[in-house]
Amino acid sequence: MAAGSGSAAAVAAVAGGGPAGPHAAGVTAGAVTTGSGAPVPGPGAVLIGDRLYSGVLITLENCLLPEHTLRFTPSMSSGLDPDTETELRVTGCELIQAAGILLRLPQVAMATGQVLFQRFFYTKSFVKHSMEHVSMACVHLASKIEEAPRRIRDVINVFHRLRHLREKKKPVPLILDQEYVNLKNQIIKAERRVLKELGFCVHVKHPHKIIVMYLQVLECERNQHLVQTSWNYMNDSLRTDVFVRFQPESIACACIYLAARTLEIPLPNRPHWFLLFGTTEEEIQEICLKILQLYTRKKVDLSDLESKIEKKKLAIEEAKAQAKGLLPEGAPVLDNTSGFSPLPKNESPKEVKGNKPSPLPVQAMKNAKRKAEGAKRTGSNSPVNGVQKGRESRSRSGSRDQSYSRSPSRSASPKHRKSESYSTSSGSKSHSRSRSRSGSPPRQFNHSSTYKSSKMRSYKKSKDYKYSAHKARKSRSRSSSRSRSRSRERSDHSGKYKKKSHYYRNHRHERSRSYERASHRYDRDHPGHSRHRR
C-alpha cells in the first residue's frame, strides 16, 4: 500500500504484536504511534511529509483508527452533525445485514461488509458519497472477500426491494433500462473507491470464534442460551464503530460480559475473568455502552436523513459558487452588457473579475454578415436573362478577361456581373449566342456613353465602320443585329436604358480584347456582308 494514501490503514496506529508468519493475510503500512499520538522512530523509519512510517507490518490484527480521526470525521467537516452521522451509519449497516439475509450470505460476509462500511466513512463524507451506493458496494465486495460471490444484479434487486418495503410501497420489479445501467456503473465505481481509500487492506478479524473459545475456557460452552445471547450482542455491535476502536478480543469479552449480566449468570471475579484475556474493565464498559445505545435510539426515517444530506450538498455548492466569484446572493456576476438591457443599471457589482467586451454586438455583426452572404449566394444562383450567372462561355483564346455581352445582366452588384461571349467550335464555324429574356428590347443594347471616347477607337479600326450607320437604318432583321455596324445606334439609345438598368452603374474603362478578336472572326467568317457593302 502506498504510504500517505489517506486510507484507514495508512493512518492506523498499529497496536500490539499479533501473530505474523506465513499465514498472515493482511499487509499494512502503518505509522507506529504511541498512546499520545507522537510517532516513535524505529531503526528503519521512513519520514514522508510530516508522518513517520516504520515500514511494512504483516499482521492479522484489525486496523484501528487514532483518536483524532474518530473525533473529527470528514462528515463533520462537511457540516453534518454527529447525531445524523450516527444514524446514517446505523441505517447503512442495517441495510447490509438485511441484504445479506435476502442474498443468503454467510454471517461472516455480512460482518465484513459492515466493517468495511464503517472504515470507509471515516475517510470520506456522507455528504459527498451516497450511503446506499456504498452499502451495495460493500455487500458485493464482502461477498467476494469471504468466497461467497453474488452477482451485482442480485445486489441491486435486493436493495431495490428493501427500499420499497421501507417506504411501504408495493414491490415492483426493477426495469432494465438506462437508469439501471447507470446505477450498476456507479456501484462498480463505489467498490473501486472503497478499495482505494482502504488501501486494499480489507482483512477483518471477527470475534465469532473468539467468543466460543473464551466460553470454553470459562466452561460455559454448554449453556446454549449464553452462547447465543453473546453471539447476538456481537452481531449488533457491528452497527457501531467499536470495530475501528477496539480489538476483537475486547469486543468478545464485552459481549460475554453483557450477556452474562443480562441472563444473571455469575462469572469469576477474583480476579476478573477478562483480565485473563488481556482486556481492561474500562474498555468493556465503553463497548457495552455503545451496544446498549442501539436499543434506546429512536427509529429515523431514511427520507429525512436524505433530505438533510441534500441541504448540506446545496450549501456546499453555494459556498463553492461564491468562492468562484459569484455575488453574495448567489447571482452570477454578469459582464458589461449595457447594449443588451434597455434600462440603465443603478449600480454595478463591487467585485468583477475583468471587464470583457460584450459578445452581443459581435454576434449581431456576424449574423448580419451571414445574411448578406446568403443574399449574394441566392442572387448569384438565380437565373438572369435565362442564363445562370455562374455559367459563362469563354472565348477560344482562353482569356481570363470578361468578354463583351450581347445580353447585359441586370444584377444590382457589379461584382457578380458576368458577360457572355460568342462561342465558336474548333471543328465547325457555327456560332451560338444565348437569347436575352430581360425586359429590354432584344435588338437594342444599352451601352454607356463612355465607350465613345475610349473605346470607339477600336471600332474605327474595323474596315466596315463607315457603313455602320447606313446599314443600321437599312436592315432590321435578327441576322443584321449581330453585326458591329449598329454601335452608333446603340450609343444613341444608351441614355434611355441607362436610367432603367443598373448594369453600367460602375463604368468599365477597358473593353475585353476578346471582343476585337470576335469582330475580326465575324467579318472573316461572313464574307457576304462585305460583298453586300461593296
Swiss-Prot record:
Region Disordered: start-end pairs: 327-534
Region (Cyclin-like 1): 94-196
Any GO BP annotation: regulation of transcription by RNA polymerase II
Ranges for region Cyclin-like 2: 209-293
GO cellular component term of the entry, any: nucleus
Database matches in Pfam families: Cyclin_C, Cyclin_N
Residue spans of biased composition, Basic residues class: 468-485, 496-511
Keyword Transferase attached: no
Secretion signal span: none
SMART domains cross-referenced by the UniProt entry: CYCLIN, Cyclin_C
Basic and acidic residues composition-biased segments: 389-399, 486-495, 512-528
Region (RS): 400-436
Annotated keywords: Cyclin, Nucleus, Repeat, Transcription, Transcription regulation
InterPro entries associated with the record: Cyclin-like_dom (IPR013763), Cyclin-like_sf (IPR036915), Cyclin/Ssn8 (IPR043198), Cyclin_C-dom (IPR004367), Cyclin_N (IPR006671)
Superkingdom to which the source organism belongs: Eukaryota
SUPFAM superfamilies: Cyclin-like
Comp. bias (Low complexity): 400-412, 437-453
Molecular function as annotated in GO: cyclin-dependent protein serine/threonine kinase regulator activity
Keyword Transcription regulation part of the UniProt annotation: yes
Notes on the domains: Contains a RS region (arginine-serine dipeptide repeat) within the C-terminal domain which is the hallmark of the SR family of splicing factors. This region probably plays a role in protein-protein interactions.
Family annotation (PANTHER family): CYCLIN
Family from the record: Belongs to the cyclin family. Cyclin L subfamily.
Its job: Involved in pre-mRNA splicing.
Protein name according to UniProt: Cyclin-L1
